Regions:
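Active-site bordering "gate/hinge" segments
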Residues: 14-188
């Protein structure tokens, strides 16, 4: 009798899904994330923190692909799975993070912690890409450094403005004043 384990079935499904995608685009996007954004190089250490897929936010395919891509490039990568962001992580979790060159979050937990000073001594990257399909998108494959140039240009426009207006035909109408004391904040 021929039997497959759950892991073998899952790997087969994962491999088939990845094979259907344009591998070149996916690899380009992974390079963008790991090499251009996170600035990782061979022999660096990487912790990938992913949220449980059953919570409905992130698919495991993206963290699995990034793990594989990193390892193929000589980056010492490992994976840690967390629950929902409402569940507080213990101090051991944060101590573990600091043992790596970089941590990439495929978890809402990373977004909640990005402005906190919990004693992080490692580089942190928060990814809002939720699956491999999104990673291989035009946005995911657009050169990271070009995105930084666009962001910096927008920052300069905001810094040199007195008033910011945001509106759309669906009803959004926000107006805010920029003062000198808050125009130099670089948190995002």
């Amino acid at each position: 009798m021929w039997r497959l384990s759950y892991l073998e079935i899952w790997q087969s499904i994962f491999i088939q899904k990845i094979a259907r995608m344009n591998d070149t685009r996916l690899s380009k996007a992974a390079h963008n994330l790991l090499i251009e954004c996170a600035r990782l190089k061979q022999s660096d250490t990487l912790l990938i923190v992913r949220e449980k897929e059953s919570l409905g936010w992130y698919k495991n395919d993206i963290s699995d692909f990034i793990l594989k891509y990193a390892q193929e490039r000589g980056i010492h990568a490992s994976l840690d799975e967390v629950g929902s962001p409402e569940i507080n992580q213990d101090q051991n979790f944060y101590e573990k993070i600091n043992k790596y060159s970089c941590v990439i979050f495929f978890a809402r937990l990373g977004d909640q912690n990005r402005f906190e000073k919990k004693g992080f001594s490692t580089k942190r990257v928060m990814s809002y890409v939720r699956d491999c399909e999104s990673l291989a998108s035009i946005f995911g494959t657009l050169d990271y450094n070009l995105n930084v140039l666009v962001k910096n240009a927008i920052d300069r426009l905001i810094e040199n403005s007195n008033v910011i207006k945001i509106n759309c035909p669906l009803g959004t109408n926000l107006i805010g004043e920029i003062t000198q004391d808050n125009s130099k904040t670089k948190e995002v």
